[in-house]
Amino acid sequence: LLSGRFQPGERLKIRDLAAEWGTSPMPVRAALQRLVAEGALEGEAQRSLRVPAMTRERFEQLLPVRINLEGLAVALAAARISAAELATLQGCVERMQVALRERDVQAYLADNSQFHLVLYQACANPVLLRLIESLWLQVGPFFHRLFTEADLSLRLNDFHSDCLKALQAGDGPAARAAIEQDLQYFGNFLLNLLSLTPPSRARQ
């Protein structure tokens, strides 16, 4: 969900997931029920769950909360981020650039998630991190829309590079501004998609 592997409307069957992960259905069911409580999944009949469809209204509610919480996390992280964490972020930026060039959707989404979450973890505020991860679980499935309908010439990695450079220079306000611009830029793009695209039927 965090990386966007599962898309809005997609049905998840407990037995299938348990088989994929090589475990019994019971722990999978417990984990998925926690995600239902977080609002990241919706329960359905016949032991299946569904990734909620994203509506314009819901996205408009999530976006400003994300911008404020994730911006705060960057501001806190900038003062304490380690050299090892900066190196991890650098690797993410470089791999995202390669993924964009090769049009590798899953690779880009995976490193995009890692970049943001490693950065936010550096804030060392568990309460803030839990809130951010809860929001990411709700919007992650919608990230696929960047690649199914977007022109890959969009500024998909520029804000990450700007944030990294600011962190390396010790400029916390600039790092926060870069992440907030990243969220707002793509938030506006996705809101436009929601305005243009009719709801789709759930994937089987």
Please give the residue ranges for each predicted region.
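C-terminal effector-binding regulatory domain of bacterial HTH transcription factors
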Residues: 172-204
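Mobile beta-alpha loop/short-helix "lid" or hinge segments that flank ligand
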Residues: 36-42, 135-137, 151-154
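Conserved amphipathic alpha-helical segments that form helical-bundle/coiled-coil interaction surfaces
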Residues: 62, 83-144, 158-166, 174-185
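Short, flexible turn/loop "capping" segments at secondary-structure junctions
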Residues: 10, 43, 112, 155-157
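Short amphipathic alpha-helical interaction/hinge segments
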Residues: 5, 139-143, 147-150, 187-194, ...
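Amphipathic alpha-helical interaction elements
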Residues: 6, 33, 78, 120-124, ...
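Short linear motifs at protein or domain termini
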Residues: 1-79, 84, 191-204
